[in-house]
């Protein structure tokens, strides 16, 4: 028991060292996942020995440990393949090589430079969905890695690899759930892709393509409040250019302006919000001195959150004991979950999650 606890502590200390170093090279990311793989193996062995708690941590079930171990092994092998490619000297962060990004669409590919694509259903500005396309998609095969660009048309999000067009998101799937007319328009940067013939989505061909066209997709992080809006997993959103191919549908050159969102009577997952931007947040509550130390320790994890406040407290608190609060904001809920899964918060600090209008 003591020996296996010591091994787990040693591995987790090395993992924490990698987080604090916050390096952006591929070698460090491979080392990170090797350590995670060792951690999974220790947890699996501990559960086999009938141990339910190890180093004050709950030991996952055998099935959960085995499933995560398989995912980690697959990701590590993909990183090894990437390390043998011309892209090994590029910048690679913890977030870009995270399991969450690896398993997001398109699955089992590395992805960089997320771009927000907004689909407006039924010509209703309050009925929109946000999706994430990627300027750089790294297709991992047995011993090779190929870089392709994520593209968009009226049908959905796709990439072209080896003369094969692969869709990883069809807009008609969500249109069946959220659209009454089964019609929509796609907003990318300052341009809008519409279907001029107004044909139903179930009659749209997903194979016929016209001549390629190019559009400049500017980064428009539009997380404006809507009656229903979802972010699929955006990464850092960069200004970029990428080619866009279309089916029978055309590109409307009218500017998006501010008409795509509404700032009144908005909701965010059932909460009434009247703001142009809603962000996931975490409140860290505890002793002000402890929070000050925690803020310093969290600086190396700046890729895992958007902004962090100074320590503050409620002035209306009559209890006399001024509980400090640090507010951390995130671009997406996925980034927040990655933060909570990665960063070790002391047990004396209370964690509260929610959303905030910014």
From Swiss-Prot:
Q: What does the UniProt PTM comment say about this protein?
A: Phosphorylated.
Superkingdom of this protein's organism: Viruses
| Region named DNA-binding domain | 278-358
Which GO terms of type biological process are on file? DNA replication; DNA-templated transcription; regulation of DNA replication; viral DNA genome replication
Q: Which GO terms describe its cellular component?
A: host cell nucleus
Q: Where is the composition biased (Polar residues)?
A: 215-225
Q: Where is this cross-link: Glycyl lysine isopeptide (Lys-Gly) (interchain with G-Cter in SUMO)?
A: 285
Keyword flag Ribonucleoprotein: no
Question: What Gene3D superfamilies does UniProt report for this protein, alphabetically?
Answer: 3.30.70.330, E2 (early) protein, N terminal domain, subdomain 1, Papillomavirus E2 early protein domain
Q: Where is this region: Transactivation domain?
A: 1-200
- Region described as Disordered: spans on this chain: 203-238
One example of the protein's molecular function in GO is: DNA binding
Task: Tell me the leader sequence span.
Answer: none
What the entry lists under InterPro entries is as follows: E2/EBNA1_C_sf, Nucleotide-bd_a/b_plait_sf, Papillomavirus_E2_C, PPV_E2_N, Reg_prot_E2, Regulatory_protein_E2_N, Regulatory_protein_E2_N_1, Regulatory_protein_E2_N_2
Q: Is Protein biosynthesis included in the keywords of this UniProt record?
A: no
Location relative to the cell: Host nucleus
Q: Which UniProt keywords apply?
A: Activator, DNA replication, DNA-binding, Early protein, Host nucleus, Isopeptide bond, Phosphoprotein, Repressor, Transcription, Transcription regulation, Ubl conjugation
Segments passing through the bilayer: none
Q: What is its main location?
A: host cell
Q: Which HAMAP family match?
A: PPV_E2
Similarity remark: Belongs to the papillomaviridae E2 protein family.
Function text:
Plays a role in the initiation of viral DNA replication. A dimer of E2 interacts with a dimer of E1 in order to improve specificity of E1 DNA binding activity. Once the complex recognizes and binds DNA at specific sites, the E2 dimer is removed from DNA. E2 also regulates viral transcription through binding to the E2RE response element (5'-ACCNNNNNNGGT-3') present in multiple copies in the regulatory regions of the viral genome. Activates or represses transcription depending on E2RE's position with regards to proximal promoter elements including the TATA-box.
Outline the subunit composition. Binds DNA as homodimer. Interacts with protein E1; this interaction greatly increases E1 DNA-binding activity. Interacts with protein L1; this interaction enhances E2-dependent replication and transcription activation. Interacts with protein L2; this interaction inhibits E2 transcriptional activity but not DNA replication function E2. Interacts with protein E7; this interaction inhibits E7 oncogenic activity. Interacts with host TAF1; this interaction modulates E2-dependent transcriptional regulation. Interacts with host BRD4; this interaction mediates E2 transcriptional activation function.
| Name under which the protein is recorded | Regulatory protein E2
Q: Which organism is it from?
A: Human papillomavirus 58
């Amino acid at each position: 028991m003591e020996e296996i606890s010591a091994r787990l502590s040693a591995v987790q200390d090395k993992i924490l060292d990698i987080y604090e170093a916050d390096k952006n090279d591929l070698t460090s990311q491979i080392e990170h996942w090797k350590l995670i793989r060792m951690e999974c193996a220790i947890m699996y062995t501990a559960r086999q020995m009938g141990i339910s708690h190890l180093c004050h941590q709950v030991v996952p079930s055998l099935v959960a440990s085995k499933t995560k171990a398989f995912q980690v092994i697959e990701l590590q092998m993909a990183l090894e393949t990437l390390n043998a490619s011309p892209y090994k000297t590029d910048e690679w962060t913890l977030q870009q090589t995270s399991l969450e990004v690896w398993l997001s669409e398109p699955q089992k590919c590395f992805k960089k430079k997320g771009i927000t694509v907004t689909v407006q259903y039924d010509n209703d500005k309050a009925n929109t969905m946000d999706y994430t396309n990627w300027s750089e998609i790294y297709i991992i095969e047995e011993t090779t890695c190929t870089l392709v660009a994520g593209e968009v048309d009226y049908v959905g999000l796709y990439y072209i690899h080896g003369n094969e067009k692969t869709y990883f998101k069809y807009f008609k799937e969500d249109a069946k759930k959220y659209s009454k007319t089964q019609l929509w328009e796609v907003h990318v940067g300052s341009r809008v892709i519409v279907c001029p013939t107004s044909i139903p989505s179930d009659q749209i061909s997903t194979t016929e393509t016209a001549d390629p066209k190019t559009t400049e997709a500017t980064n428009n992080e539009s997380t404006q409040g809507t009656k229903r809006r979802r972010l699929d997993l955006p990464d850092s959103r960069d200004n970029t250019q990428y080619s866009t191919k279309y089916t029978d549908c055309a590109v409307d050159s009218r500017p998006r302006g501010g008409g795509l969102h509404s700032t009144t009577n908005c909701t965010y997952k059932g909460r009434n919000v009247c703001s142009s931007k809603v962000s996931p947040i975490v409140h860290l509550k505890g002793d002000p001195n402890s929070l000050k130390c925690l803020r310093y320790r969290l600086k190396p994890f700046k890729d895992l959150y958007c902004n962090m406040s100074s320590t503050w407290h409620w002035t209306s608190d009559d209890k006399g004991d001024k509980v400090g609060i640090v507010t951390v904001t995130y671009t997406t809920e996925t980034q927040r979950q990655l933060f909570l899964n990665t960063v070790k918060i002391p047990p004396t600090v209370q964690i509260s999650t929610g959303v905030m209008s910014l």
